[in-house]
Amino acid sequence: MNNRPVPELQTDPEFDELIQPREEKYLEELEENIFDHGCLEPVCVWNGIILDGRLRYKICTKWDIHFNIQRMMFESRDKAVSFICHEQLKRTDLTGEYKKYLIGRLFRADMNTAIDEFMKKHPGTELNADGQVSQKYVRKTDIATIIGNEFNFGFSTVTKYDIYA
């Protein structure tokens, strides 16, 4: 037990959707491991919201076990979504459907970030008839290719997974 005050951290429903639920056996093993060895990985937090480590946080607060917090600095919610997707895509227990969903969400978040960054640099840019930034300024294929290279998919597969998001 420790005498430090436990920080009140929040979860976010949108961020929670990005995390595939764990099996009961995993939860039991994680709790036992933290109880025996302490919390070895920090809880990643952005603006008081847990991005990674919500299960660790829950276990540590339940048993009054010390844990570290890593404060993440993101300019936007989309960058926080991108971080969560990257962390979750490292998991080996993801279902195929969840992996598609995460790739789609990552693609959308990175597209939104690219559009926001472009509009900050070029505030007078006219939008196309759909109210979007033209492909000649922010190319979907470029962003999809970067994601595809990172996770071993073709760019067309990444853009296709946008429908799952």
Stretches found by the model and what they are:
Residues 92-165:
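Alpha-helical interaction elements
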